[in-house]
């Protein structure tokens, strides 16, 4: 039986030295982040392998650590017994059923979406997925998805349509947490807010508090 991830504060790593990224991950998890996706493009496979290993050793016993796109890296690190819990894949990556077959039933697998059509397509594979990411919430400099921003109201429709928990992504900040939580999303993915914060622990706590307020 695979674990149910806590997606409320979902940290996605950004650009920076490996030391800085690991430090931010550790501090974000101290503030309550319970899912960490290692994604620092552009990066070589070996660099991503080393970074994921470092993040997993730092926080993998407390938070679920996912690898962006690279199923092979997740497989290799899991084979070594490291606390790497799964992957997040995009629309152009391996088919999710093949990812599940490779990683096994206990791995966490997320998929990028952001339109009605993509959510409906994800619903067809709901039994092999754990959640979907949907965005962008607003335009973001960290990733150009080619999809129009959803805004707050765009999430209500996707949450209602989805058979899976939905994570909002795309320049989400802690200030957005109450309004986005009110739409029914399961969590908020944050890159810059945590990477650039002088206090990632406090930032994560503020986001989780705001998320709880939006759910009341």
Swiss-Prot record:
One of its GO terms (biological process) is thiamine diphosphate biosynthetic process. Mg(2+) binds at residues 69, 93. GO terms for molecular function: magnesium ion binding; thiamine-phosphate diphosphorylase activity. Gene3D superfamilies: Aldolase class I. GO terms for cellular component: cytoplasm. InterPro entries: Aldolase_TIM, ThiamineP_synth_sf, ThiamineP_synth_TenI, TMP_synthase. It catalyses: 2-[(2R,5Z)-2-carboxy-4-methylthiazol-5(2H)-ylidene]ethyl phosphate + 4-amino-2-methyl-5-(diphosphooxymethyl)pyrimidine + 2 H(+) = thiamine phosphate + CO2 + diphosphate; 2-(2-carboxy-4-methylthiazol-5-yl)ethyl phosphate + 4-amino-2-methyl-5-(diphosphooxymethyl)pyrimidine + 2 H(+) = thiamine phosphate + CO2 + diphosphate; 4-methyl-5-(2-phosphooxyethyl)-thiazole + 4-amino-2-methyl-5-(diphosphooxymethyl)pyrimidine + H(+) = thiamine phosphate + diphosphate. Its cofactor is Mg(2+). Its EC number is 2.5.1.3. Keywords: Magnesium, Metal-binding, Thiamine biosynthesis, Transferase. 4-amino-2-methyl-5-(diphosphooxymethyl)pyrimidine binds at residues 37-41, 68, 112, 143. It is an enzyme of class 2 (transferase). Binds 1 Mg(2+) ion per subunit. There is also a thiED fusion protein in this bacteria (AC Q8FTH8). Condenses 4-methyl-5-(beta-hydroxyethyl)thiazole monophosphate (THZ-P) and 2-methyl-4-amino-5-hydroxymethyl pyrimidine pyrophosphate (HMP-PP) to form thiamine monophosphate (TMP). PANTHER family: THIAMINE-PHOSPHATE PYROPHOSPHORYLASE, THIAMINE-PHOSPHATE SYNTHASE. This is Thiamine-phosphate synthase.
């Amino acid at each position: 039986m695979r674990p149910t991830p806590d997606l409320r504060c979902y940290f996605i790593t950004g650009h920076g030295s490996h030391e800085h990224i690991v430090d931010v991950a550790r501090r974000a998890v101290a503030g309550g982040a319970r899912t960490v996706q290692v994604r620092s493009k552009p990066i070589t496979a070996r660099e991503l392998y080393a970074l994921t290993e470092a993040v997993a050793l730092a926080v993998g016993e407390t938070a679920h650590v996912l690898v962006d796109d690279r199923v092979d890296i997740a497989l290799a690190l899991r084979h070594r017994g490291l606390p790497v819990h799964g992957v997040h894949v995009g629309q152009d990556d391996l088919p999710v059923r093949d990812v599940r077959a490779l990683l096994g039933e206990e791995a966490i697998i997320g998929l990028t979406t952001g339109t009605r059509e993509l959510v409906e397509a994800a619903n067809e594979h709901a039994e092999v997925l754990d959640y979907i990411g949907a965005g962008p919430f607003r335009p973001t400099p960290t990733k150009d998805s080619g999809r129009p921003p959803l805004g707050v109201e765009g999430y209500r429709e996707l949450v209602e349509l989805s058979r899976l928990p939905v994570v909002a992504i795309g320049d989400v900040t802690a200030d957005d947490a109450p309004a986005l939580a009110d739409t029914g999303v399961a969590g908020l993915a944050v890159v810059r807010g945590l990477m650039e914060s002088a206090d990632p622990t406090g930032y994560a706590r503020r986001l989780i508090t705001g998320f709880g307020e939006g759910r009341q």
